[in-house]
């Protein structure tokens, strides 16, 4: 699946080429982004080869669940998957039903994964990875390695050691060669434009998640 999706084409066609692309639970350049991962690339032939290796040389059929606002993008993704032999039935649902699937883990097939990408995997990834998590948790596997790392991250008091553990978690899940791919292929980080007066200095706007945005060094040059 991950090799079958052309993320740059999705960005250009549906996000005006303005999305911040990523391939793990972090913004590139942030404290928890792991630069050493093996990355997924758009490689349909490799996708076909891996499907055959897994016993699906003739492909298979599954569902893609989407809300109306994302249906065009999901249809494009379905077409890409179809080219490698993964045939998808598009199932459009309302937001309430989609949210219930996320909470109950009762979806069948594929659906989008919405998550808060912030530099605290113990909290934000924990909402989805923990067996008692609020969203998606009831519909995914919970491998021992990832669960042990999650608990270590939550208990860690040293910031540097915590970031090291968080990068280990990124590798455990998102490395193209060895990762468990629990949450599928990450596409992009949603962001919006911010406008400010040019005399606002050292505010670090857009560089941090709002909940941990530090304005202590900000000053006005006027």
How should each PLM-predicted stretch be described?
Residues 2-35, 68-78, 99-222:
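Detector for C-terminal structural segments
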Residues 59-68, 88-89:
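Short, well-ordered beta-strand elements
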Residues 87-100:
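Early extracytoplasmic/lumenal segment of secretory-pathway proteins
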């Amino acid at each position: 699946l991950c090799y079958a999706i052309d993320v740059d084409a999705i960005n250009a066609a549906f996000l005006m080429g303005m999305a911040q692309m990523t391939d793990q639970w972090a913004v590139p350049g942030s404290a928890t982004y792991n630069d050493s991962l093996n990355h997924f690339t758009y490689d349909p032939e490799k996708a076909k080869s891996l499907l055959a290796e897994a016993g699906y040389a003739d492909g298979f059929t599954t569902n893609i669940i989407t809300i109306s606002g994302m249906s065009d993008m999901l249809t494009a993704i379905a077409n890409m998957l179809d080219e490698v032999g993964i045939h998808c039935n598009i199932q459009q649902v309302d937001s309430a039903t989609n949210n219930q699937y996320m909470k109950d883990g009762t979806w069948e097939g594929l659906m989008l994964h919405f998550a808060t990408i912030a530099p605290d995997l113990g909290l934000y990834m924990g909402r989805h990875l923990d067996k008692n998590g609020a969203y998606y948790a009831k519909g995914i596997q919970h491998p021992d390695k990832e669960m042990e790392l999650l608990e270590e991250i939550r208990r860690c008091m040293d910031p540097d050691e915590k970031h090291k553990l968080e990068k280990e978690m990124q590798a455990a899940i998102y490395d193209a060669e060895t990762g468990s791919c629990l949450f599928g292929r990450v596409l992009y980080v949603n962001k919006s434009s911010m406008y400010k007066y040019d005399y606002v200095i050292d505010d670090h706007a857009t560089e941090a998640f709002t909940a941990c945005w530090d304005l202590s060094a900000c000053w006005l040059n006027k």
